[in-house]
């Protein structure tokens, strides 16, 4: 069982068949469940380009990413877990669908050789 995080309600989703571990995946990518946009900006202040963290979104069951852009400013974007059984994620763009690492790089508009979770 995995917990889908939401500011309003925690929901559980059965993911037995695939073995996809939602919480483990999120924590590998700098999951910060208790912070908002302003706190994310403070945490990322002074970090290198494409450093990111994940957090709950204030919009329903969505998740949010906060990351440092090329210009040094922090950008925020949202994405959704569309298939908890297989760990398929999606951002608003039709080609931003796939595994969490792929969708993260798509949102940051960088390759897999760039970008690192905040430590």
Question: Can you describe what each PLM-predicted range is?
Answer:
Residues 1-119:
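Eukaryotic phosphotyrosine signaling hubs
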């Amino acid at each position: 069982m995995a917990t889908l995080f939401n500011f309003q309600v925690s929901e559980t989703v059965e993911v037995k068949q695939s073995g996809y571990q939602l919480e483990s995946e999120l924590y590998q990518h700098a999951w910060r469940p208790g912070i908002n946009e302003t706190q994310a900006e403070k945490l990322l202040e002074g970090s290198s380009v494409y450093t990111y963290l994940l957090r709950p979104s204030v919009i329903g069951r969505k998740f949010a990413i906060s990351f440092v852009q090329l210009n040094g400013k922090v950008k925020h974007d949202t994405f959704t877990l569309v298939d908890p059984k297989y760990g398929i994620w999606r951002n608003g763009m039709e080609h931003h669908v796939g595994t969490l690492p792929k969708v993260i790089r798509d949102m940051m508009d960088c390759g897999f050789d760039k970008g690192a979770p905040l430590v």
